[in-house]
Design a protein with these regions (language model features):
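Alpha-helical transmembrane segments and their helix-entry boundary regions
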Residues: 7, 34, 129, 137-144, ...
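Residue-level recognition of transmembrane alpha-helices
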Residues: 11, 38-41, 78-79, 111-114, ...
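Helix-terminus/linker motif at the lipid-water interface of multi-pass membrane proteins
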Residues: 16-35, 97-101, 157-162, 215-245, ...
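Short membrane-interface helical motifs at transmembrane helix boundaries
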Residues: 26, 83-108
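Cytoplasmic helix-loop-helix junction between adjacent transmembrane helices
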Residues: 103, 118-144
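Hydrophobic alpha-helical transmembrane segments
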Residues: 112, 142-157, 161-188
Length: 260
């Protein structure tokens, strides 16, 4: 129960702080920016797909099959593949925003921030999950609090100093990336590249296929819904903001059960 509470705290924190951030950015910079949450909402399921295979699956592969190289192998392979996928999305950011029926000129800069933040959060989650499976829950929660507060403080403080969106994004993303990189290096183990990807898929197959389904549902569903304009987008955003934290907290039950 104690571990469940710690994990639920971590997952709800990961969801709650970005929600507050988008609210404040909407007040400080541009009221439309809160809709970035909905614009990039489908992409979080790419995050969960990678996490399912290369973090959860890899950690279970280590525990069940005695493959001590699985966790670090999953981190490295997952990082390489996720860099390629998120890089492709960023390279085609204009097409993505257009597909979602939103204004490129309004949303592009902070859409880039949102995608980069999601990518860095994925890399961070690889290490966080590793610590949970090693039962270093207190340390994992400490890192989680620092990561989220760092993201929040940098983003909001910079937006209060300047309204230049590019400067805000750079000033937030670079320190966040450096912090995550330091944690990965600090908590990495020596390993040989060895991972049974098919077993990793099998061990967390239910969550994996759920996330693939949700990716397709939200990608095409929100694309159609956002055709109705900014007011409808705002309504969808508020619904997502309310439910997202609850979903992440409930996900702690799955995470805790999987670890056990």
């Amino acid at each position: 129960m104690k571990r469940l509470l710690r994990i639920s705290f971590d997952l709800s924190l990961l969801s709650f702080i970005p929600i507050i951030s988008w609210f404040l950015l909407g007040i400080i910079i541009d009221k439309n920016l809160i809709n970035i949450f909905t614009l990039t909402y489908p992409l979080q399921f790419i995050y969960y797909i990678f996490k399912s295979i290369f973090s959860t699956g890899a950690n279970i592969n280590k525990e069940k099959d005695g493959n001590n190289d699985a966790t670090m192998s999953g981190l490295v392979i997952g990082s390489i593949l996720s860099t390629l996928v998120f890089g492709i999305i960023l390279f085609n950011i204009d097409d993505y925003i257009s597909f979602m029926n939103m204004d490129i000129s309004i949303y592009k800069t902070f859409a880039i921030y949102s995608i980069l933040e999601l990518y860095i959060s994925l890399e961070f989650s690889f290490i966080l999950n590793k610590l949970y499976y090693e039962e270093k829950n207190v340390l994992a929660n400490k890192y989680s609090i620092i990561f989220n507060l760092l993201n929040f403080i940098l983003l909001i403080a910079t937006s209060l100093i300047t309204k230049n969106q590019t400067v805000i994004v750079i000033a937030t993303i670079i320190p966040l990336f450096i912090f995550t990189l330091i944690l990965i290096i600090k908590n990495s183990d020596k390993f040989k590249l060895k991972l049974d990807i098919l077993k990793c898929i099998k061990y967390d197959s239910v969550e994996l296929f759920n996330n693939i389904a949700f990716l397709l549902i939200f990608l095409f569903g929100l694309s159609n819904a956002l055709e109705y304009g900014d007011k409808y987008a705002l309504a969808l955003t508020f619904i997502s903001l309310i439910t997202d934290t609850q979903w992440d907290t409930f996900d702690a039950i799955v995470t805790s059960a999987t670890i056990d």
